[in-house]
A protein has these predicted regions:
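A general lysine-centric signal
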Residues: 87, 93, 191, 206, ...
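Short linear functional motifs in flexible/disordered or boundary regions
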Residues: 21, 108, 114, 132, ...
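Generic secondary-structure signature for well-ordered alpha-helical cores
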Residues: 34, 38, 192-195, 222-225
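Polybasic low-complexity intrinsically disordered regions
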Residues: 2-148, 214-217
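Short loop/turn segments at secondary-structure transitions that flank enzyme active sites
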Residues: 54, 59, 159-161, 222
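A short, amphipathic alpha-helical segment
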Residues: 214-221, 225-228
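Helix-centered, glycine/charged polyanion-binding patches within enzymatic domains
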Residues: 125, 129-130, 135-212
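A short, flexible helix-boundary coil/loop motif
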Residues: 193, 224-239
Length: 239
């Protein structure tokens, strides 16, 4: 059929923002993919990760219309890169939980200054067989929660200046990193394919919905690719 006009799509997006519907839609898309045995929920793992995205309105002062140039609901994300250099980004953080095939199961968006570990409980499913995460989520609270859920702890360990990681934990972290790499692929899709390395809107609610729509598009595209490559799985062997 005909592609709707941009104004129609904009009004639809605004309705999603107003009624906070993107998460329900993502859940429904995943339910339908699960019903077709494209997403497999039994025995699934959960890979949680986060990425900073720059606020499109990150300058100081006011524009010609008198409105602030800076998105006040964004925040500074500061992280040390692999070379030990601190990198600062004024914007938001997109937090996702994906399965081993790269389908997004949970997602949320926060101001950039919110620590990644704060959203751990938002991303936990409760029925995952294992949780993969980086050292930002390494804590006794995380380990205790995973034990209550009966979930295997695949969270990387932290090293400290006066207590560096043992050789065993370094090897463990390296093994976890191989699986965790799958959790970063949606971010590459968002930034390179969907042009979302920077936000397009002012405010948390609008950006939450924008990245929620991106998550839905990501899962639909991946589901279509699975169908093209493999066809519909035999339900007798899919579970």
């Amino acid at each position: 059929g005909d592609v709707p006009e941009a104004s129609t799509l904009g009004r639809f997006r605004n309705q999603l923002v107003e009624h906070d519907l993107w998460e329900r839609l993502l859940g429904e898309i995943n339910r339908q993919l699960d019903a077709k045995n494209i997403i497999l929920t039994e025995g699934r793992i959960n890979i949680i990760d986060a990425t900073p995205v720059e606020a499109a309105q990150s300058g100081s002062g006011k524009g010609k219309d008198g409105q602030p140039k800076r998105d006040k609901q964004a925040g500074w994300h500061v992280k040390e890169d692999s070379r030990g250099t601190l990198k600062s980004t004024y914007g938001y953080s997109v937090h996702t939980g994906v399965d081993e095939d790269g389908f997004i199961q949970r997602q949320t968006v926060t101001a950039g200054n919110v620590h990644d570990s704060v959203e751990r409980d938002t991303l936990l499913l409760g029925d995952e067989t294992a949780l993969y995460a980086d050292a930002a989520d390494s804590s006794k609270a995380t380990r205790d929660k995973l034990e209550r859920f009966g979930t295997a702890d695949q969270v990387q360990r932290k090293g400290y200046r006066n207590k560096p990681l043992s050789a065993k934990n370094r090897r463990r972290n390296d093994a976890i990193a191989v699986i965790r790499a799958g959790g970063e692929r949606p971010f590459a899709t968002y930034k390179s394919r969907y042009g979302l390395a920077r936000t397009r809107f002012m405010g948390l609610a609008k950006n939450m919905t924008a990245y929620g729509i991106a998550a839905i598009a990501h899962n639909l595209r991946k589901g279509a690719k699975f169908l093209t490559l493999y066809g519909l799985p035999d339900p007798n062997y899919a579970r």
